[in-house]
Amino acid sequence: MPQKVRIALDAMGGDFGPSVVIPGAAISLGRHPDVEFLLYGDAKLIEKELAAHPALRKASRVVHTDVAVAMHDKPSVALRRGRYKSSMWQAIDAVKKTEADVTVSAGNTGALMAMARFCLRTLPGIDRPAIAATWPTMRGDSVVLDLGASIGGDAQHLKALAIMGAAMASVLFDLERPTVGLLNIGVEEIKGGEEIREAAELLRAMNSQRFDFIGFVEGDGIGKGAADVIVSEGFAGNIALKAAEGTARQLAEYLRAAMSRTWRSKIGYLFARDAFKALKDKMDPNKSNGGVFLGLNGIVVKSHGGTNAEGFAYAVDVGYDMVRYDLLTKINQTLNRDAGALVATPSAQEVVS
């Protein structure tokens, strides 16, 4: 376990670049003083933001890059134009070279996945990486994956996701045998496509001692906390994520409007202010920011591109926790134990951007 956690940041990533990344890193540093940052991007822009954060400046090293991956770049274009010389690539490469323990970027999802996969490669037995994140539920938190790394997936791919997600839940939630469910349109065994039904059969046949497969989980089961780990292919997983985030913002706006409609509601809000603040915090998507790319020979964390500084800080916190929990080692150990259960299959599936 390293004394210092070394975090490489793609300072040019996201909708706002250094104006969000640098203040966000400063917020996270305040919570984790044992962090050293490598900041990749336009040195002039980075230094301008660092001037307002002397503690972060002291804990950082700036590495200038001339190329930044645009949010609208296709993965193939980003690889061709930004391989080796972009802020995103160099931040990932720092993990490969063991100069950093984790990479965090708010940049283009498809480009980040393509570069991470190309630079770091996948773990043995893993055909494609997945994006996993913790999801607030009525029972605490669950790990949900894949949230949009790739589209589609056969039964073996879903099985690999279940194994990796269970390893992540075991580490984060200190569970000896987390429950695992497959996201489906119904809980009955006859529901869903051939791939998901076959995946369920494979997971039941494993009879794993490291997780408890409970079968299918419907969409509303995610928020209910029906399982410690919810597994889906990336298309449905990303839709579920965006729908939940949109619903949270919609409800927050409804509450704000209702509480400011009349003088009576305003007085009522004053009496219930603490409860409403707790609800707002629970529903804030920024506080669940930070998806982990599972299945790579290194740790990469993806932040929402449009997040604010506080939201980006939470993504940096996720990266910090993954290093301190030694997640990569734990996943490797789990995959090695279950090596016979995994069969990597080549795939040309499109990366979600």
Curated annotation (Swiss-Prot):
Q: What is its EC number?
A: 2.3.1.274
The record's Gene3D superfamilies line, in alphabetical order, gives: Isopropylmalate Dehydrogenase
List the Pfam families hit by this protein, alphabetically. FA_synthesis (PF02504)
SUPFAM superfamilies per record: Isocitrate/Isopropylmalate dehydrogenase-like
What would you give as a GO molecular function for this chain, any one?
phosphate:acyl-[acyl carrier protein] acyltransferase activity
Catalytic activity field: a fatty acyl-[ACP] + phosphate = an acyl phosphate + holo-[ACP]
Q: Where in the cell is it found?
A: Cytoplasm
Biological process (GO), any one = fatty acid biosynthetic process
One cellular-component annotation, GO: cytoplasm
Q: What InterPro entries does the database record attribute to this sequence?
A: FA_synthesis (IPR003664), Phospholipid_synth_PlsX-like (IPR012281)
Domain of life per record: Bacteria
User: What is the predominant subcellular site recorded for this chain?
Assistant: cytoplasm
The protein's UniProt keywords, in alphabetical order, are: Cytoplasm, Lipid biosynthesis, Lipid metabolism, Phospholipid biosynthesis, Phospholipid metabolism, Transferase
Please give the pathway this protein is involved in: Lipid metabolism; phospholipid metabolism
- Assembly description: Homodimer. Probably interacts with PlsY.
Q: What does this protein do?
A: Catalyzes the reversible formation of acyl-phosphate (acyl-PO(4)) from acyl-[acyl-carrier-protein] (acyl-ACP). This enzyme utilizes acyl-ACP as fatty acyl donor, but not acyl-CoA.
Its family remark reads: Belongs to the PlsX family.
What is this protein's name?
Phosphate acyltransferase
Please name the source species: Rhodopseudomonas palustris (strain TIE-1)
